[in-house]
């Protein structure tokens, strides 16, 4: 009897445990819009992400073709329900819908219509609906090609459920928008349905590490009144409990690794009547760009600063790099970078009149100027790293968002320039441009091989018997290290704020500070810091000679990783600290030299210490040879960094000599 009672009790407790464990994860959103259910209204945290400020309860996207005015169009029907979990999540009530709508009349375009939104709140135990009025919907032009529809759902606070829906119509029957299954907040349920007429032949690409339900079936639909149905294909994708796309310090574009669906039109095929191949090559892209008035025509134009260049006698400079640098510095006096990246340009006259411009406008002007010096240049079109990688196998203009400039000294030597690198140099570019590119009327080129960050640190210090450590820190920055150092200094409110930040990082008092080369267009910068700090003294002193590390802390601590590791660029840090030990102290045990390598030997760490004639010398070199490490390399990478930081955290033991 006792055994039977315990069995029943165990089953009851186990059932209760399972029901509690699965209570939140079993939330079923109401797929019919206009009436959130009780569970959706009462939920207070995301079942699988307690840090989430909001979550998508339900997102449904339907894509269909319609036939109108003798052509096909695409309609996107989007419906979404969001739960606001905390006050920090109320920004989800601000809705922005970008779409393509050129200023010029005529031509293909997109349009947004049928926008509706409602906020649902529980007030005194009853659900209160607040609909968004039309006066909360605004249209804004982003540029001459893009518009955005903005709206704000009213009465939104922590606990609110938001619903909104709209329809986007597109004249671009050959292009289906990328569908993102994941968003920047967790998604409880999402569905994507696409129906495509049989005459359109698409390639389907599905990416992401999370599992989606997928089905495909043949169907029929009449697109013209009183006509026979056309054969179609229906694709359906569903996802549940998808995590948020979160920022990561070692991933440039987290959305690139999220679950998403891409359709690429391969051909239009009407058997026996019509066939057209829509697969584009880089040759096609090159031809389109060079025919474009805002790209190819900008390259072909003359030099608007020819007289200024002649007056500056730039053509008489014999050194190639100095000649190019002098040309850019003349241009820089006329036009500053406005912080934006672009692929297409504006009128040279307007750019020079305005005095500030995108990197593209600056690049076009430099190409015009160098052409007058008989220096060959070529645009290198690319996609900045924060927007994802460039699809080299199926290129499209839509995948490009800017370009850099290849500058040829001769047939075998090319330098890369970009107008956004105001504090850089030839081959010294912002990290977001260090990616695969395509040279127009040329070939593929990986700008990353131009990127290298080098830093050389030498510290000479004296440790006094009262514990005062005084020294001179000297650091030389090269390449991308120089660019980052200059940017960091210039982003500070003033030099006092910047020096205070450095003092905090060094855990020292800074008596004198200088940074040379900060305003120069050069690949180098030089830093000098005169410092002092207190060391606890006694019969035994634990002294850490590593005042600077490649990264402030161990960069990788998570046991698992769903995304690759992307460093800004290859890097090399060399460090050497010389410390004069006070009289009356000695060092009995100096750490043995050590070499550590990552599993693929693409990161190497070397360290060595010596003690001679009262001088302690500690050095290390840290060399990252490649910038990208895939997920399967992460465990070895994590263990390697842990081992490196164990070495960097080692202390030297000083012992007082008995008198």
Predicted regions and their residues:
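Contiguous, well-ordered alpha-helical segments that form the cores/surfaces of helical PPI scaffolds
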Residues: 5, 13, 328-329, 353, ...
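A carboxyl-terminal module marker
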Residues: 499-659
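Secondary-structure boundary elements
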Residues: 282-354
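Sec-exported extracytoplasmic/periplasmic mature domains
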Residues: 85, 167, 310-314, 332-336, ...
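Bacterial Sec-dependent N-terminal signal peptides
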Residues: 1-29
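Sec/Tat-exported extracytoplasmic proteins
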Residues: 170, 331-335, 644-648
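Beta-strand-rich, non-transmembrane domain signature
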Residues: 24-281, 288, 346, 361-367, ...
